[in-house]
């Protein structure tokens, strides 16, 4: 990272940013064609879980190439100033790299869906078997991640 003073290396701090993020941006590629989608997600033990339709561009791309990049951010705010060149942004972000795989076991899919819902709610949910079968669940094992922050006094 070029700006070492903005780098976040502490694993707990990185996981806290992920845990407090509302959106995971999943980047994939098909040859020379990049594709990014914002998704609801869940995080547990170094793995990101996402879900969606079993058909579509995201699914097609992940079947061809399981290598992905992830982005999470929180505490984003524009910091204005008198001069244009002094404007800035406050943020904390995490970029992660990993490998995606499809979860097919029904019990594992339910666990992943619980983890996803746990990102947004403290409630327990029931997932009907027919809905679990119809839902694509993807696990992404994070192989590396880095964080960056700007606009915080404790940098």
Model regions and ranges:
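Extreme N-terminal tail/first-helix region
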Residues: 1-20
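Short, conserved, surface-exposed binding loops centered on an aromatic residue
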Residues: 17, 40-41, 60-62, 85-88, ...
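Short, intrinsically disordered, mixed-charge
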Residues: 19, 63-68, 114-122
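Broad gene-expression machinery/nucleic-acid interaction feature
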Residues: 23, 36-38, 67, 91, ...
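A short mixed-secondary-structure module that forms the rim of ligand-binding clefts
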Residues: 42-78
């Amino acid at each position: 990272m070029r700006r070492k003073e903005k780098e976040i290396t502490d694993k707990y701090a990185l996981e806290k940013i992920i845990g407090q993020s509302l959106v995971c941006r999943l980047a994939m590629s098909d040859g020379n064609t990049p594709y990014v989608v914002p998704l609801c997600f869940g995080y547990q033990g170094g793995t990101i879980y996402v879900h969606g339709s079993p058909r579509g561009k995201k699914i097609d791309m992940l079947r061809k190439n399981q290598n992905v990049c992830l982005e999470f951010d929180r505490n984003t705010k524009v910091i204005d100033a008198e001069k244009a060149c002094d404007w800035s942004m406050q943020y904390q972000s995490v970029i992660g790299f990993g490998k995606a795989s499809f979860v097919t076991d029904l019990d594992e899919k339910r666990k992943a869906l619980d983890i996803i819902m746990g990102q947004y709610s403290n409630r327990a949910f029931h997932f009907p078997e027919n809905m679990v079968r119809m839902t694509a669940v993807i696990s992404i094992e994070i192989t590396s991640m880095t964080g960056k922050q700007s606009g915080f006094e404790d940098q």
